[in-house]
Amino acid sequence: MNITGIQSDWKVEKIEFARLTGERARSAGANGRIGIHGKSCSVDIARITIDGQTGYGSSIHMTPEWAEDIIGRRLLDLFDDRGRLREAYRLQLEYPVFDWLGKRLDKPVYDFVSGAHMERGVPLVVPCYDTSLYFDDLHLPDERSAVALMQEEAMQGYAKGQRHFKIKVGRGGRHMPLWEGTKRDIAIVRGISEVAGPSGKIMIDANNAYNLNLTKEVLEALADVNLYWLEEAFHEDEALYEDLKEWLRQRGQNVLIADGEGLASPHLIEWATRGRVDVLQYDIIWPGFTHWMELGDKLDAHGLRSAPHCYGNAYGIYASGHLSAAVRNFEFVEYDDITIEGMDVSGYRIENGEIHIPATPGFGIVFDDELVTNLVKRSGWS
């Protein structure tokens, strides 16, 4: 990233912290690991003031004592010689700092992080998928009703511009008897593929609720479905992924293997470079945007694909779109339909399975200054 425009006298003057709250458009049910996720969501936000101007962004692992130590530091000193934000400041401040930089430079973030693959001066439009299809059917005793309910949820997304869908599977791993749950997984994926149509891409995510042979059973049953990737079928294991990749190759079934969200194996990237995994999915909030720019360079060099995980953090959804400008083999923005009070994302829009990223300065998200100020006083800190 080019930081030559950062002036040496720009200093951090103030850091404020608040938690904004909101709701999903629809309550989210269970997945293969845990129970109902619900409707409520929150975003921890930092507002940074540098040279009299503010920037907003997601912030984690920040304490008042840590922030106090940053006050008075030069913005330039937060970056290393490569123009990357130093590791010590990333999780706490990378988003508000990048938002501030965009506003000061009068550029969207994607403009000043973009790689050589990006065409300048054209709107940034990025593929996205609806990630809201959880186990909302567990209360229904029969498969037909379950499929109808999940199809209706997919149609809600379709009506809002979504064309690609990720479907939670693994009902038999915890919440239903094994074969009954697996059979329902298959039926629901088939039903939602009808909603998506032949051009819609379908992803399935088991949250590690399958094993190798169960994975093969499901993939064989879905061989005629436009299945794009399989995510977290089981806990990462190179030997099992090698077996699965060879099995898919012998069948001529072109399904990508995706993994990396959560507490992934530290060897996962190494396995991916050896052809065991196709799509890496580390989270956009942790380890974050700058980490992803560095990782994306490495994955691009090996012909691997990037699809940052983002669920439950509304800020990360929109930040992911900007990251696509820095990573050539960026696949999708993971989209969860969330409204956060005081966070205006109306500059973004979804059409035909793509999210249109606004060309406004910073991340293009408008925060309610007065609301944030009140939250800082009432329940946050400065």
Language-model-detected regions and their locations in the chain:
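Short glycine/serine/threonine/alanine-rich loop segments
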Residues: 107, 304, 329
